């Protein structure tokens, strides 16, 4: 029964991977949020089946589901700005060594490396 529903959903969401992610998100919302009035009619079905049916029927806004999914994946911590000037000076001192770090194009440390081709034989990439 769910397979037919998944095929019906392909008309609304053609990408199966996207369908799986969005249907999973909606099923979790059905499971955790109180929607007892709407689920009573479909009580014998599990949340994934209900989610697929509602997506296939167009009862669910795909854009809203995507936005809800994106919001759920965002970090919830907020970065507080530095208020104290002394703190910012301390942080500068901690990272002063970074100006000494440099990136070069010198790969001489790879000279003694052994490279193996797909046949398992040694080869020199410079030749």
From Swiss-Prot:
It comes from the Bacteria. GO terms for molecular function: DNA binding; DNA-directed RNA polymerase activity. It catalyses: RNA(n) + a ribonucleoside 5'-triphosphate = RNA(n+1) + diphosphate. One of its GO terms (cellular component) is DNA-directed RNA polymerase complex. InterPro entries: DNA-dir_RNA_pol_omega, Pol_omega/Rpo6/RPB6, RPB6/omega-like_sf. Its EC number is 2.7.7.6. GO terms for biological process: DNA-templated transcription. Keywords: DNA-directed RNA polymerase, Nucleotidyltransferase, Transcription, Transferase. HAMAP family: RNApol_bact_RpoZ. Promotes RNA polymerase assembly. Latches the N- and C-terminal regions of the beta' subunit thereby facilitating its interaction with the beta and alpha subunits. Belongs to the RNA polymerase subunit omega family. The RNAP catalytic core consists of 2 alpha, 1 beta, 1 beta' and 1 omega subunit. When a sigma factor is associated with the core the holoenzyme is formed, which can initiate transcription. This is DNA-directed RNA polymerase subunit omega.
């Amino acid at each position: 029964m769910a397979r037919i529903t998944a095929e019906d959903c392909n008309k609304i969401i053609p990408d199966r991977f996207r369908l799986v992610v969005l249907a999973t998100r909606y099923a979790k919302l059905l499971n955790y949020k109180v929607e007892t009035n709407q689920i009573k009619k479909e009580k014998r079905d599990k949340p994934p089946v209900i989610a697929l049916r509602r997506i296939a029927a167009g009862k669910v806004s795909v854009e809203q589901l995507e936005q809800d999914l994106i919001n759920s994946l965002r970090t919830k911590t907020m970065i507080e700005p530095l208020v104290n000037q002394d703190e910012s000076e301390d942080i500068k001192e901690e990272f002063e060594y970074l100006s000494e770090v440099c990136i070069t194009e010198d790969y001489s440390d790879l000279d003694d490396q052994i490279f193996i081709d797909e046949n398992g034989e040694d080869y020199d990439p410079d030749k």
